[in-house]
Amino acid sequence: MTSRFMTDPHAMRDMAGRFEVHAQTVEDEARRMWASAQNISGAGWSGMAEATSLDTMTQMNQAFRNIVNMLHGVRDGLVRDANNYEQQEQASQQILSS
C-alpha cells in the first residue's frame, strides 16, 4: 500500500475542519446521552441499580470526552503543520530566489 503525505496546507486546514465537525458531533451526542441518562435515573431507579447506571454513564461520558480531546489534538496538529509547511516553503523560495 502506498503512503501519501499531505503537503497542501489548504487541504490540511480543510481536514482540520472536518475533525472539528466530528469532535462537535461526538460532544453533542455525549451531551444528549448524558441528559437521557439523567432523565432515566429519576424514573424508578434506586439503590445499586441507579448508582451502577450513573457510574457507567460517567465512565462513558469520560470516554467521549477523551475522544473529543483526541480529535481536537489532530485538528490542532494539522493546523500547526500546515502553518509550518507554509513557513518552510516560503523560506525555501527565498533561499532559491537569492
Swiss-Prot record:
Sorted keywords for this record are: Secreted
Location (main, coarse): secreted
What InterPro entries does the database record attribute to this sequence?
Answer: ESAT-6-like_sf, T7SS_ESAT-6-like
* Taxonomy, superkingdom: Bacteria
Q: Give the residue range of the signal peptide.
A: none
The subcellular location is: Secreted
Q: Which cellular components does GO assign to this protein?
A: extracellular region
Pfam families per the UniProt record, alphabetical: WXG100
Name the family the entry cites: Belongs to the WXG100 family. CFP-10 subfamily.
Q: How does it assemble?
A: Forms a tight 1:1 complex with EsxV.
UniProt name for this protein: ESAT-6-like protein EsxW
Which species?
Mycobacterium tuberculosis (strain CDC 1551 / Oshkosh)
Instruction: Give the encoding gene's name.
Output: esxW
